[in-house]
Amino acid sequence: MDIDASPQVHANQADDVFLIVGDKSKLQTFEERLQLNYDKGERYFEDKAVPDATIDDIDMDFVKEYTDEIDYGKSPLEYLKENRGFIKEKDGEIQISTAAILLFGKNPQNFFPRARIRFIRYEGTEEKFGTEMNVIKDVIFEGTLLNMINEAIAYLDTQVKEKTYLGSDGTFVTDAEYPKFVRQELIVNAVTHRAYSITGTDIQIKMFDDHIVVESPGKLPGLVRADNIRFTHFSRNPKIAEFLKNYKFVKEFGEGVNRMCNELEQVGLKDLVYHTNAFMLQAVIYNSNVGKTIVEKTAYSLIKLAVAVNKSLIDYQKPAIGEEKSAIDDKKSAVDKYVFIE
């Protein structure tokens, strides 16, 4: 018997909460129950007060930049106090929320050391360990969420291969191995929707020869599942999501995954794949080399080169005596039939 997931956390008369795992029910600890509340949106970790944080830990100059961006007329401090509960007063003390530190903090990693992005480049198509470790780049991005996103996107752009070829119209065309929007959206989604309550690990971008994996702490939130993620939206961190929306990383909530899938389809790449591995969500995209052997890749490159050379020669070929221009056009048409999508 299949039981649909509930959008709420339910407790029995003894106030115990159980999670169905396979055909068994597992009693949840206090921490596991709290994480369920965060995942289902009954509570938001971004609203949690940060111990020992004070107003001096907030970069008011950056808050001013943001309020200018959204045309907010009052002071930065008034914005933090009067909007979204970034700062609250309780029992005569000022409480600084997690969202305030992550978005506007002078040094968010002082309070959340693993709230960062780590880029790892591997040689080959799989992750190896020990004496076979194949890491060739390892770069960490820190700061506010906006700073991390901008730096990670810019760095990933430098790692993506580009190919230039002669198009059917006779002009040179340059394509990246992964669409730019897809690369950007994977990073934005990871930062926006990660479970910041899971403090022991960071967001990781793992780049291989034939695919990229973006790992983000936390499972799919709410009722979002791998089979409905393309058209279902749920925000684990609504304040963070709204902040990033105001910086126009995406036009509207919920359109990003669908657009990523569409762009991958348009360039002939495999579908975006999501996996849940323990407490980590993995998003995987593949480039055109996936599944090809070394021999196939070499042969493919040689054929492409031959076609490009032949096309160039035909373009500059003059009709021989007695040869009609239509014969040259027929040759061009034959070469144009070789359309390559890596």
Show the residue positions of the predicted features.
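Divalent-cation
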Residues: 1-18
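Flexible glycine-/small-residue-rich
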Residues: 3-5, 106, 121, 207, ...
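Active-site helix-to-loop segments that bind/position phosphate- or nucleotide-bearing substrates
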Residues: 20-185, 190-199, 218-233, 256
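Short, surface-exposed charged micro-motifs
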Residues: 118, 202-204, 271-273
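ATP phosphate-binding glycine-rich loop and adjacent ATP-lid/helix-beta elements
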Residues: 181, 227-269
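ATP-lid-like helix-loop hinge signature
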Residues: 194-216
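Glycine-rich/acidic phosphate-handling loop/turn and adjacent ATP-lid/helix
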Residues: 212-246, 290-298
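Short, low-complexity, charged/polar intrinsically disordered tails
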Residues: 266, 271, 284-342
